[in-house]
C-alpha cells in the first residue's frame, strides 16, 4: 500500500492481531488472502475508505446469523462526502432480495455483504481475473446459481466515502466496465 496504511496500522499495532502487507494481484486477490487468513465464522469486507456508522453494526449482523439459518446478510449503504462524513451524497437502499430484481441488474452493496466462511470454503473465492466486477460475480454465484439463503437488514450498515476506486468518477466506472469485458 502507498497510502500511509502501514504507518497507521503500526500506530495501532496493540489493537491488531494479524497483519499481511505484501504484493498482491489486485483488490480481489487481497480480499481472498484476507478470507483465507480469517479465523472467524462470518466474514465482512470493509474497503479502505468505508466505515461502520456505529459500534452496533457487527452485533446486529451477528445476531441475525445467530437467530437464523442464513448464509449471507446485507443492508443499506450511504455514500458520504469525503471531507464531511455526516453529509450524505447518496442513499443506496437495497430492499429485500428477490431473483427477478437480480436478473434485472439489481445489486446489493458489496461492503454490506456478510457471508459465512463456510460458504467461501464450499463455493470458492473472488475471481481475480475480473478487475472490478468480481464482487458482482460473487453475488450472482452465491444468490443466483447456488440460491443461498440471504437476509436483508433494513438499516445503514456501511458508510462509503466518495472518491474510492469504483466511485471516484463516471469515467472510472466506464474504464472498469471496459477492463471487465
Q: Positions of the model-derived regions?
A:
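Compositionally biased, charge-rich terminal segments
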Residues: 170-181
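Nucleotide-sugar donor-binding/catalytic module of glycosyltransferases
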Residues: 1-172
Amino acid at each position: 500500500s502507498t497510502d500511509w496504511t502501514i504507518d497507521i496500522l503500526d500506530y495501532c499495532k496493540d489493537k491488531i492481531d494479524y497483519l499481511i502487507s505484501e504484493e498482491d494481484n489486485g483488490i480481489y486477490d487481497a480480499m481472498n488472502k484476507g478470507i483465507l487468513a480469517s479465523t472467524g465464522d462470518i466474514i465482512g469486507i470493509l474497503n479502505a475508505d468505508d466505515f461502520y456508522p456505529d459500534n452496533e453494526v457487527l452485533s446486529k449482523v451477528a445476531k441475525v446469523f445467530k437467530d437464523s439459518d442464513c448464509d449471507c446478510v446485507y443492508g443499506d449503504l450511504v455514500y458520504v462526502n469525503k471531507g464531511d462524513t455526516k453529509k450524505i451524497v447518496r442513499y443506496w437502499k437495497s430492499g429485500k432480495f428477490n431473483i427477478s430484481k437480480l436478473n434485472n441488474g439489481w445489486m446489493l452493496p458489496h461492503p454490506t455483504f456478510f457471508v459465512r466462511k463456510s460458504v467461501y470454503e464450499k463455493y470458492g473465492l473472488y475471481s481475480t481475473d475480473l478487475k472490478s466486477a468480481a464482487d458482482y460475480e460473487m453475488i450472482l454465484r452465491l444468490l443466483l446459481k447456488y440460491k443461498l439463503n440471504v437476509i436483508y437488514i433494513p438499516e445503514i450498515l456501511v458508510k462509503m466515502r466518495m472518491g474510492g476506486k469504483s466511485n471516484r468518477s463516471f469515467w472510472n466506472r466506464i474504464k472498469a466496465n471496459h477492463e471487465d469485458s
